[in-house]
């Protein structure tokens, strides 16, 4: 059993604070064997660059490039079709000439899977490649790459289907100029359906295609935005979902998850940021999830290691927001974003000076023990809206002077 702290990484802003890169740095520095996503779902986009290798993590934990196994907790969502595309991207990179023999080191040209078609609600079919990988290498003397990474998912995690995605996009489009800034991945619709009191599709159900088809039919029947669905299509989609799920996921029980946490060999990876919290953010521009450390702390307490928790608050030297909603002191800071661009659903990537009141609010709600401060290569200190203003940040555990893992330094 490890004796060092169990780190819970959460965002202090509106997302894009460097949570994934922080998880990668902590895993690599400490040799941690596991990462656990405890909130949010497949709508996350955590960018990690390790020695020039880039990947955007949505399904897999951000410690994957450093060799950590990926776990998903009971309060998360998963999308089997998106997951198999992401897995394929990693596998293509490993087999395409970029692998150097080290476990978990995909090609630097690997990219995250393409999102579902933004105009029609069509998902990439399970047999279609999600990204264009590196070309096959003519060098046949390379060692055989490791098998495709897999994800251990709690049996209670909710499953997003193409129907959730279609309804999500139709609902968001109908809002017109009042759009909320949805990611268009069906995450909110998946959570909302469960909150309505219906029995949702969960990871533990994914071994039975008939049960999956029944869930799809009931969801379509109950939706106010789906007129009709062909029964044959439902049967095919149920088989596709089951097949994709089996290729990526291994279902685990409460006991298995808590046993892993009890070893202390884990970094807990949060998604989104405090200012998007379902209860603490500014409605309606929020997510359907708690973005504080609460759910991770709860799991650690149930596993008997609650006293070892260390909360790591991730933030940039400046504030950002991807999509609609309030962003105090918004300004064009002249920052070039390599991996955050305007998208049809999330919207524009925006920047701002930090508002002292907002930052104090986030610190008060999250109560981080330490900070992971990124983009120190862009601004050498936290960029406040009022020059010289301070907010009393906790000690910096991880300082990032660039996007790569090698640009990050850990205190102590």
What are these model-derived regions, one by one?
Residues 95-148:
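Intrinsically disordered, low-complexity terminal tails and inter-domain linkers enriched
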């Amino acid at each position: 059993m490890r004796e060092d702290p169990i780190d819970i990484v959460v965002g202090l802003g509106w997302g894009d604070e460097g949570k994934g890169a922080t998880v990668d740095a902590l895993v690599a520095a400490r040799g941690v064997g596991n990462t656990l996503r405890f909130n949010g779902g497949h709508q996350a986009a955590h960018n990690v660059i390790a020695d020039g290798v880039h990947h955007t993590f949505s399904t897999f934990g951000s410690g994957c490039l450093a060799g950590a196994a990926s776990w998903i907790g009971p309060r998360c969502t998963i999308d089997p079709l998106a997951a198999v595309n992401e897995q394929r991207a990693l596998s293509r990179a490993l087999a395409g000439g970029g692998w150097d023999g080290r476990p978990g080191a995909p090609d630097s040209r690997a990219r995250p899977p393409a999102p579902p078609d933004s105009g029609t609600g069509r998902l990439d079919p399970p047999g279609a490649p999600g990204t264009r990988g590196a070309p096959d290498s003519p060098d046949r003397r390379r060692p055989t790459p490791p098998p495709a990474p897999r994800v251990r998912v709690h049996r209670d995690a909710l499953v997003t289907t193409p129907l959730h995605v279609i309804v999500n996009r139709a609902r968001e489009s109908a809002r017109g100029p009042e759009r909320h800034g949805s990611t268009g991945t069906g995450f909110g619709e998946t959570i909302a359906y469960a909150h309505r009191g219906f029995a949702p599709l969960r990871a533990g159900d994914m071994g039975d295609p008939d049960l999956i088809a029944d869930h799809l039919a009931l969801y379509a029947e109950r939706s106010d935005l789906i007129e009709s669905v062909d029964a044959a299509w439902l049967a095919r989609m149920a088989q596709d979902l089951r097949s994709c799920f089996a290729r990526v996921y291994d279902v685990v029980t409460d006991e298995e998850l808590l046993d892993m946490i009890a070893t202390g060999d884990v970094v807990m990876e949060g998604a989104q940021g405090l200012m998007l919290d379902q209860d603490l953010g500014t409605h309606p521009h929020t997510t359907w999830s708690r973005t504080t450390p609460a759910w991770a702390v709860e799991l650690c307490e149930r596993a008997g290691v609650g006293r070892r928790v260390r909360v790591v608050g991730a933030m940039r030297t400046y504030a950002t927001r991807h999509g609609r909603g309030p962003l105090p002191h918004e300004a064009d800071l002249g920052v070039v974003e390599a991996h955050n661009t305007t998208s049809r659903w999330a919207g524009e990537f925006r920047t701002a000076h930090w508002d002292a009141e907002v930052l104090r609010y986030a610190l008060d709600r999250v109560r981080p023990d330490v900070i992971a401060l990124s983009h120190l290569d862009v601004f050498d200190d936290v960029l406040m809206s009022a020059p010289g203003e301070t907010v009393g940040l906790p000690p910096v555990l991880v300082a990032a002077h660039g996007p790569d893992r090698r640009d990050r330094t850990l205190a102590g």
